[in-house]
Amino acid sequence: MRLLHTSDWHLGQTLHNYERGYEHQRFLDWLLDTLVAEQIDVLLVAGDVFDNANPSSASQKQLYVFLQQARVRLPALQLVIIAGNHDSAGRLEAPGPLLAAHGTHVIGHILRDNAGNIDLERLLLPLTGSDGAVQAWCLAVPFLRPGDVPKIASDSGQDPYLGGIALLYRQLTDLALARRQPGQAIIAMGHCHMVGGEMSNDSERRIVIGGTEMLPSGIFDAAKIGRASCRERV
């Protein structure tokens, strides 16, 4: 199975009042050609699809035209899209039922049942090969705000936010391990900063105070993340 991981498209962004739609279109055209040339089976988009929570009709059309063209050129392509901190989770997820019928899974929200338990099932997606058999399980975790994460014991000594994120990934990993068969991979997605990564003051606005949203890289064996605004080592 061949996967391509990308993020932070920021469709609809302007730079000093200059509309960047042409640049974004050139990127999407390149990405489409790359998907075909490399015969990609799964495209992972790790958040910040749009630059703001109220994207223009033009930028929304740009996304949906790309998705349609990708499916035409690669009919078996699977796509997994998670919301980032710039996205409106509800707006991104709204066409989800229609997109899912065409191989595109969109996860914007963390949902809970009446008892307050997080719906883990919708965050764990099977990825299938050309023969229809499951080859990998994807932990599709969108951008997490403090209210999204499970509560941890007050006497654990951990930061409630970071500990809650780690717990959520452990719960999802345990669920994936229970489902996986020999030879099946487990792939974790997220949209977050990592401790030690360089933050761009020019393009990334802070929305959580004090750096508490920056995750220690040690909680992951491997991370397919979005939110980095420049090349960095973590």
Model-derived features: where do they sit?
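Extended recognition/assembly regions associated with phosphoester-bond processing machinery
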Residues: M1-V45, F50-R233
